[in-house]
Every structure is written in C-alpha cells, then in structure tokens.
Amino acid sequence: MNLLCCCCCSNMAPNQRVTRKWELFAGRNKFYCDGLLMSAPHTGVFYLTCILITGTSALFFAFDCPFLADSINPAIPIVGAVLYFFTMSSLLRTTFTDPGVIPRASNDEAAYIEKQIEVPNSLNSPTYRPPPRTKEVLVKGQTVKLKYCFTCKIFRPPRASHCSLCDNCVDRFDHHCPWVGNCVGKRNYRFFYLFLVSLAFLAVFIFSCSVTHLVLLMKKEHEVFNVIKAAPFTVIVVFICFFSIWSVIGLAGFHTYLTTSDQTTNEDLKGSFSSKGGPRTQNPYSRGNICLNCCHILCGPMTPSLIDRRGIATDEFIQQMQHQSSPRHALSDVLSASHMVTTSQPMMGGLGGGGIGGAGGGISIGGAELKPRFYDESNPSSSTLEGNGGAINGHGNGHGNGFDHPPPSYDLVQNGNSNSLAQLVDNEIPLVQMDIPAYTHQTATQARQYRHRHHKQRQICNGGTVSYENQLANASSEDELDDPDVVVVGSPEVVAAVAAIASNKAREMRNRSGSYSNLFDADFEAALVNSSLADNHVRGEGASSSGKPSAGAALLAAAISGKTENMYSNVLPVDNDTDPADSTLHVYSNIIDERKQQEQANNVLSSTLLCDDLDLDDPVSASCHVKRKSLGDGAEQVKSAERLRMLHDNTMIDTALDLDSLDGSSMGNNSQSCLVKSGKPNATSVTTNVAIV
C-alpha cells in the first residue's frame, strides 16, 4: 500500500504557485483572504470606529444590562445584542465588499477608444481643436454626458466617478467614507445605509438605557457624587453616546432622503438634480415613487463584481498589467543611459558646434558622450558653475554653455507682477546662448567665481538725441579682460548689488509725489570717481595696492545710487538700428528704448515748464544740459563743474530766478529741473535750466 502511494506521488506534477489577478490589481485597494475581501488602502479610521462601537457596547452590557434586566425587563440585553449584531455586520459588509469597481481598459481597448475620439488630419487643420472627451447618451429621454477617465482609459458609465484615494472608477459612486474604510458605491450602498440606521438605533437605545440607569440610582442615592461613584462607567457611556448620537442621526436622515429620491451624495453636492446650479432638472434615475426607490436601492438584485479578483493571471495578463503600472517614455532609454540628476530648477543647455545641451537634464547629443549636469543649491558660486566642472556646460564639438537659475526670490513669490529689478533677474529665463570663454584664474578663490556680464550704456550727445551702445565682451584671454564692459565680480557682491537695486527701485516708487524733493537728483557717482580711473578700466576682484576700488565695490555703490541698470546675465545688446518691435528680441531688450523715451520726455517737459512759468522781463533763455558720463570721465566732470561755477558768478542765477512765479504744476513727478544752487561743484550729473538776463 505504501509503495502504491509513493508511485502515485512520483507521477504527480510539482506544486507550482498560482498567481491571482488581485495580486496584480492596478488600484490601491487592499485584499484579504486570497482576494475574497477588499478594502480601501487606509483603514486606520475604520479600526477606530470598531473600537468605539465595541467598547461602548461592552461597557453597556457589563454595567447597565444586569441592573436594567433586574429592575425593568430581562429583554433589554437581547435587544441590545441584536442591534449590535446588525450594526457590526453591516459595517464589516460595507468595508470588505467590492463597492462596484469598474475594471480598466486593456491596451487594445484603450487604443480603440483613442482612435474613436481622434480627429483625422487634425494637426494639419488650421481650426484644430482637441478631441472631445465626453459622450452623450439618452436616459429616459434626457441627455447624460459620459466623461472619459484618463487613468482607467474608459468612458465612465452614468453616475460613476473616479475615487482618487482608491484610484478606481466606481459605479454609482456615492462618496469615500473613511469611517467604514471603503468607497460607497452601487454594490455596498445598501449595507452602508443599514449600518447608519442600525447604529442610530443602537446609540439611541444605549443612551436611553444608561440615562434610565442613572435616574434610578438618583432615586436611591439622592446625591450626584454618590451616583457617579456607584456607576462611573455608565457616566462614560452617556457622554460617548450624547456626543455621537446627533451626527449619526443626522447622517442617517440625510441618506434616507437620498434613498427616497434615488440620488447619491456626489450628485446632491453638485446639484445635478436640484436648483442649486441653475434650473431644476428632473432626475432620470428616479422611479417616481418613494417606495419604489427604496425597494430598488435596498432590496433590488445585487449586481456581480466586475473584477475577477480570484482569477488566475495568465502571462498575457501579467504583461499587460506590468505595462499599465510602469509605462515607459520614448526617451527613457536615453535618459537612463545619461545617469542624469534632475532638478526642479530651469536649466539651459548650450548649442555648440556639434552638441546640443538638453534643457533640464543635461544631455548632450551630437558628437559628445552623455554627460550629467548638477545644480548646487547650497553654493551658487561653487566650482560647479565654472570651467571643467561640467555643471553648466553641455558641449559637443564646440563650446556650449548653459545657466542654472537659483530658486525664485521672495519678492517673486509674493508679488508675481512686480516690476522690481530683483524679480526680473530671478525671473529671467535663458532664451539664447551666451559664449563664456574659459579663463583660468590664478588663485583658488578666483576659480570659484563666475563672470557676471555688466552691460553699460554709453550715452553720446548728438544734437539732443541719445544713442546707446550695448557692448558684450567675449574675453578669450587675460589681456581681453581689460574691456571696461566686462567686470569679474563674486557671487555675494552680485547678490548685494541686486538687492540694492531692488531697494532703490522701491524708494523711487515711494518718492513719486508732488513734493520738492523730486526736483533734486542726488548723484552718488562723484564719490566713486578717482583720478586713477580716467581711462575707465576696471581690473581684478579686489582693491590693488595702488588704491583702486574693486569691481564689486564699484558695482555695489553704483547699485545703491540707482545708476546701475541692465544687470542681466544674458540680455542681448540692442543697437539703435534694431527694430524694437522685432519679436525675436529678448523679452527685456526693450527696457533701454523705454528709458530713452522717458528721459527725452522729461527733458522736454522740464524745459517747457521752466520757460512757461518764469516771469522775467524779456529774458534770453538758455539751457545748459550736461549728460551723465561714465565713472572714468573725470576730466569732463571737472570741466562741467568749472563751467557751472563760472555761469553762477557771471549771471547771478540766484537773483534772476523768480521762484514765487512758478506754478504748482511744474513740481510734478516728471520734473527734473534743478532750480537751487548745488552745494557740491564736482557733481557728475547736473541738469540745470538757467535764464540769462
């Protein structure tokens, strides 16, 4: 006999583990008992509900039922047990029952649906519109829209909705209830309603019985403290039931209304069949009778589950579910080969002779191997921004450079429409390539600094017109760094200069009023002028032994005075012959044109108001207009100061001007007339209108 058993066992196939479909389910639901039971992914509140109901009932059965059975009726414990049984069975059935999950479309079904909603030759049509994602069906003569679910790749049936917590489309979706730990839908709504009703009855029953117990004790003890000492757990049960009974009864009443009208919580909140969202529409799903609606919802046939949870997963099904759970992009192989580190900061890859720097990922394609790029948020001036670090350089056979942008400033976050210069620098999106030739600094400190492009505008007086020349130096050697338009500064100095510019802009906005303070132009450049800077050459990072001010100090001082402008890292130079309306220009390249127009308008307005308001006897008006020069024009500034002193001594400006005859309108915001004698003859920028008698 034993030999026969051994032979039979040897002929049997080896035991292989069978994969069920619930193990590969695409949603977030939890499954128990080999797929027989399912619930929501988060069931912590459900366990709290069970503890509250079970604990309160246990206290009632242990301390109240014996006294009430002897004093009133022995059937009280039986009624309480029946209500507790109905409540817990309805709760468990609601939690572990499939609410009506609609299975997702397979790959072939999704492709077929996409083909149906696709518009032929849509990309070539000038009136192209995205394909519609809704369908219309008739339900009892009323049009109902079917919405397309992008997650499940299906057109949802009427009254269905997608639960974001469970990540499934549920038929006749009512709501997601964390107290029961599951969605409430078509297949478990009846159990949910029975749970609410039975819980309401149980709470009312326990509360009334506990209060009765306390009242009977009061008749014997005649003191509240003695009653509390005699039945402390009864007092706890009364408090729990008192604070929970109102919400339970209200929720049960609300769902009774929904059941009698054949509506869902989702439809009631949206006002689909009420006058909340407009004219009242008739509910096409109602049977027209309260009893029929209740019988259909609570006593109607229960539809089978649409998901085959315990079915055996075939190889085709496994491949399909793996494809749905982890879709791959067309460039996923390229991205994985580059081992890139993605950041949330915008980046720009340079375009060189044979390479293209990818935006955001640091991929260089065309002649060079794939290379990662990084952004060092902790140290913007670190060596990863310079030279051979490869942090911002996405290069092929040529030189291609990119810029990493730091996180947006607080001013940008708080005021998105702010016009401050700090926001423009932070909000600047690199649209073009800027070639920064490699330059090896001699010290380690200089190697950790990057070149900041400081665009200076040279103003040339040509018959009253102002022409601007923006120069961008592409230094390729140490000798070419003598260009006055290229300043090598450190990152902290740039940040300080930008902050000073922002403060200066805010101060100008506050000073725009009709006060006399707007008539003066306190020019701060005189403090920065040195006789050793006559050739307007700025060299090095710090002050040299000869006493030359550092480029960072000059930049910061000019920023504080409000004379520094166009401090952008990649703003293209704008010439006079460039059309300002050209759409290919940089987004900030029209700032110079606006400033030019504003300054010309100010000059015209100032001279006009002065000539109209001065009450002089046949004066010969003359205007001495000295334009602002650069920092290095020391000789011109001295000449201008001497001319002003000579003009003051010869023409008696103080007695010739009748300040009382000036109209108040000349004190406007745009007036820049200097009508008071300047105390500093060496001012670098003076705009004065005089009348020679």
From Swiss-Prot:
This is Palmitoyltransferase app. Residues 377-406 are annotated as: Disordered. It is found in: Endoplasmic reticulum membrane; Apical cell membrane. Belongs to the DHHC palmitoyltransferase family. ERF2/ZDHHC9 subfamily. GO terms for cellular component: apical cortex; apical plasma membrane; endoplasmic reticulum; endoplasmic reticulum membrane; Golgi apparatus. Disruption phenotype: Semi-lethal in homozygotes and heterozygotes with adult escapers showing abdominal planar cell polarity defects and also extensive wing planar cell polarity defects, both proximally and in a distal region between the third and fourth longitudinal veins. Greatly reduced accumulation of dachs at the apical cell cortex. Palmitoylates Dlish which is required for the apical cell cortex localization, total cellular level and full activity of dachs. The keyword Transferase applies. The active site is at 177 (s-palmitoyl cysteine intermediate). Residues 147-197 form the DHHC domain. It comes from Drosophila melanogaster. It is an enzyme of class 2 (transferase). The chain crosses the membrane at residues 43-63, 72-92, 191-211, 233-253, 347-367. Detected in embryo, imaginal disks and pupal wings (at protein level). Enriched in the somatic musculature and gut throughout embryonic development. Keywords: Acyltransferase, Cell membrane, Endoplasmic reticulum, Lipoprotein, Membrane, Palmitate, Transferase, Transmembrane, Transmembrane helix. InterPro entries: Palmitoyltrfase_DHHC (IPR001594), PFA4/ZDH16/20/ERF2-like (IPR039859). Its main location: endoplasmic reticulum. The DHHC domain is required for palmitoyltransferase activity. It is a multi-pass membrane protein. One of its GO terms (biological process) is establishment of body hair or bristle planar orientation. Its EC number is 2.3.1.225. One of its GO terms (molecular function) is protein-cysteine S-palmitoyltransferase activity. Interacts with Dlish (via N-terminus including SH3 domain 1); this leads to palmitoylation of Dlish by app. Interacts with ft; this is likely to interfere with the interaction between app and Dlish, reducing the ability of app to palmitoylate Dlish and tether it to the apical cell cortex. The lineage of its organism: Eukaryota, Metazoa, Ecdysozoa, Arthropoda, Hexapoda.
